[in-house]
Amino acid sequence: MSSVTTPAPVYTWTADEAIKFLKEWNFSLGIILLFITIILQFGYTSRSMSVYVIKMIILWLMWPLTIILTIFNCVYALNNVYLGFSIVFTIVAIIMWIVYFVNSIRLFIRTGSWWSFNPETNNLMCIDMKGRMYVRPIIEDYHTLTVTIIRGHLYMQGIKLGTGYSLSDLPAYVTVAKVSHLLTYKRGFLDKIGDTSGFAVYVKSKVGNYRLPSTQKGSGMDTALLRNNI
């Protein structure tokens, strides 16, 4: 005697249920979206480093969430067309996620800085101040970089790095590390403003996959490869 398989019930939302859901979750969703919008709008290294870190965490979580959703779409595809698109999107998301990790690891090997895993950019500016290497992300490799000292406070491209420095501590070269090569910027202009303030302009002078000698005597390491990053 053959058994008849009962088809699983298909649940669909009605318009009233959708409206009820929006009414119940509208306030919470609005707060969450407002929070994310503020973080993405004002999360810059030159404004607030803590807000910028939260922004990077949000961006970093976007890839795994996207992969989870695309896999979910593959498992519960509505039809073969949706299944095909879901498989393609899943493969693309996974490949881009792997490429991101490969590039981040390569940049980490070059700089030794955890900023290498920044999902926003693969450009890390590096400045060696009296043997201490500061590394910060920048959006692009500019033709010039500006380093400013205001009453002992060190700023590079508007990003505060440290305190207790003077113009005489500024190095002759700064670098921008990328995944495949290193950009060297040579100090082209220096101007003193008052007794404890001033600025220097560094101009891009060399690009290539090479090593720049360290300013630390006897360290045997490269300026863009030092491990005492901050």
Curated annotation (Swiss-Prot):
Virion surface face of the membrane: 1-24, 77-84
Q: Which GO terms describe its cellular component?
A: host cell Golgi membrane; membrane; viral envelope; virion membrane
Q: Which residues lie on this side of the membrane: Intravirion?
A: 46-55, 106-228
Q: Where in the cell is it found?
A: Virion membrane; Host Golgi apparatus membrane
Q: Which GO terms describe its molecular function?
A: structural constituent of virion
Keywords, alphabetical: Glycoprotein, Host Golgi apparatus, Host membrane, Host-virus interaction, Membrane, Transmembrane, Transmembrane helix, Viral envelope protein, Viral immunoevasion, Viral matrix protein, Virion
Residue intervals passing through the bilayer: 25-45, 56-76, 85-105
What is the recorded function of this protein according to its Swiss-Prot or TrEMBL entry? Component of the viral envelope that plays a central role in virus morphogenesis and assembly via its interactions with other viral proteins.
The protein in question is named Membrane protein
Native species of this protein? Turkey enteric coronavirus
